[in-house]
Curated annotation (Swiss-Prot):
GO MF, any single term: cytokine activity
PTMs per UniProt: Disulfide bonds have critical and distinct roles in secretion and activity. Loss of each conserved cysteine results in high molecular weight oxidized Wnt oligomers, which are formed through inter-Wnt disulfide bonding.
Localisation per UniProt entry: Secreted, Extracellular space, Extracellular matrix; Secreted
Organism in which the protein naturally occurs: Sceloporus occidentalis (Western fence lizard)
Protein name: Protein Wnt-3a
One of the GO biological process terms: canonical Wnt signaling pathway
Length: 123
């Protein structure tokens, strides 16, 4: 009898954190574009070009955009956004729940509360 060896290869995704960090870097360095319409033999053609010429042109692997995101700080019935006014924020956080970001530069009020709660502790 002979021996048989099977080798199986497959692609696996990197860690979710690695993918998230990669996408965040792309988002942070995205290039703003403008849509230009010009006439060619087959009709009107739309192309994208960088809005600012002093930045390098994006490559095929770069992220680009041509519309700005809506302002989520203020209420907007069209988008269904309630804004961020009167939201609870975390003074010590530099993340999306932090007061610097969530309050959109409007400042924030600090409130201290004392509560008595039964904790069902067992000693």
């Amino acid at each position: 009898s002979g021996s048989c060896e099977v080798k199986t290869c497959w692609w696996s995704q990197p860690d979710f954190r690695v993918i998230g960090d990669y996408l965040k870097d792309k988002y942070d360095s995205a290039s703003e574009m403008v849509v230009e319409k010009h006439r060619e033999s087959r009709g009107w053609v739309e192309t994208l070009r960088p809005k600012y010429n002093f930045f390098k042109a994006p490559t095929e692997r770069d992220l680009v955009y041509y519309e700005n995101s809506p302002n989520f700080c203020e209420p907007n019935p069209e988008t269904g956004s309630f804004g961020t006014r009167d939201r609870i924020c975390n003074v010590t956080s530099h993340g999306i729940d932090g007061c610097d970001l969530l309050c959109c530069g409007r400042g924030h009020n600090t409130r201290t509360e004392k509560r008595k709660e039964k904790c069902h502790c067992i000693f």
